[in-house]
A protein has these predicted regions:
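Fungal secretory targeting signals
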Residues: 1-23
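Intrinsically disordered, flexible peripheral segments
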Residues: 20-342
Length: 342
């Protein structure tokens, strides 16, 4: 039976789709951007475009690091991975969670384009399309062994290092079922993780369908109807390593393995598609009311003492890029972003 609550969710879904359509269809090229890169959903890309993106990621994994003094880093991809390990405690469950990751993914996109000749934009994985279906998430095109990122881990093909402190490293042992068995990254060696460990190991996964409830269109609609940035951010992000999962944690745990880890999740290239979709949901929320474009709030750290996050709060990207204030990344139609979602 179609309930009143179902009707509300349906209306919210219609509203969010209309807002996202407006992002491209009714907006002229913004001042300051020569053009807008169009971030598209993975399954809408032609096979050749998917392979171009995968090859660009593999290129980044083969380029030497810009900072030769960075411990264990052997590639530009490693440099991005290492920064997340360093900053994770500061950029999760805080007000800067969304703007920090927006800038982080943008820098990754820039590296793919400027250093590896990639002509497109960073794609996103609209996991709500997979969560809404009756099929397993493992059937998503992002897990295709040829035109995707490979599938599941093989049981028993990976073991955590002896004496690993799973609490300090926020590791869920059940998520690390084994090494990815197919696809373009099955033989790639990660230098960082799990957690804050520095160890050479394979890319691991344990794809789980029980996370679908946090990734469906209903969850997205419920988040975007919240009135304040802080309420929206909490509903989208959730709390790490607790039963209170939301879209952010649901995507990480749905993939499992390295992606499930609070610190080392960017070791899985799917991280950047997952966070592009989270950024897209934030963009939906921003566009619903004019005052939301520059609305920011929240604490600067999980534990006191902390300050309130404001538009002037610095986004520290370590050796990847200059530190800039949050206000500079709030509008994706302005530099340094200059992209949109289609």
């Amino acid at each position: 039976m179609f309930s009143a609550s179902s009707a509300v969710v349906a209306l919210l879904l219609t509203a969010t789709s209309r807002v996202l359509a407006q992002d491209v269809e009714t907006t002229p090229t913004p001042v300051g951007c020569e053009t807008l890169l169009q971030r598209r959903e993975w399954r809408t890309l032609a096979d050749s475009e998917k392979l171009d993106y995968i090859n660009a990621v593999k290129c980044l994994q083969s380029l030497p690091p810009l900072d030769p003094t960075l411990t264990a880093a052997q590639s530009r991809f490693d440099e991005f991975h290492a920064l997340h390990l360093e900053k994770a405690d500061l950029v999760h469950v805080t007000g800067e969670f969304l703007p920090w990751h927006r800038y982080y993914v943008k820098l990754y996109e820039d590296a793919l384009r400027n250093e590896c000749g990639y002509a497109g934009a960073n794609p996103y994985w609209a996991w709500e399309q997979d969560a809404d279906s009756a099929s397993s998430i493992s059937g998503s095109p992002v897990f295709d062994p040829v035109t995707g990122f490979g599938g599941n881990g093989g049981p028993g093909t990976y073991s955590l290092p002896p004496d690993t402190d799973i609490t300090a490293n926020r590791i869920d042992p059940d998520a690390f079922v084994g090494c990815v068995q197919d696809g373009p990254f099955k033989d790639y060696t990660l230098r960082y993780g799990p957690g804050q460990l520095v160890t050479d190991h394979c890319l691991t996964r344990n794809i789980r369908d029980d996370s679908a409830q946090f990734l469906d269109s209903k969850a997205m609609a419920e988040a975007t109807q919240l009135p304040t940035y802080e309420e929206f951010r909490i509903e989208l992000e959730g709390e790490p390593i607790t039963p209170t999962h939301k879209m952010h944690d649901g995507g990480h745990y749905g993939v499992g393995g390295e992606m499930s880890n609070f610190y080392s999740s960017p070791g899985d290239p799917l991280f950047y598609l997952h966070h592009s979709n989270l950024d897209r949901v934030w963009r939906m929320w921003q566009l619903m009311l004019p005052d939301r474009l520059y609305e920011i709030s929240g604490r600067s750290t999980v534990d006191p003492p902390y300050v309130n996050v404001t538009l002037d709060y610095p986004l520290d990207m370590g050796n990847l890029a200059a530190t800039i204030p949050i206000r500079d990344v709030m509008d994706i139609w302005s530099p340094p972003n200059c992209y949109t979602y289609v």
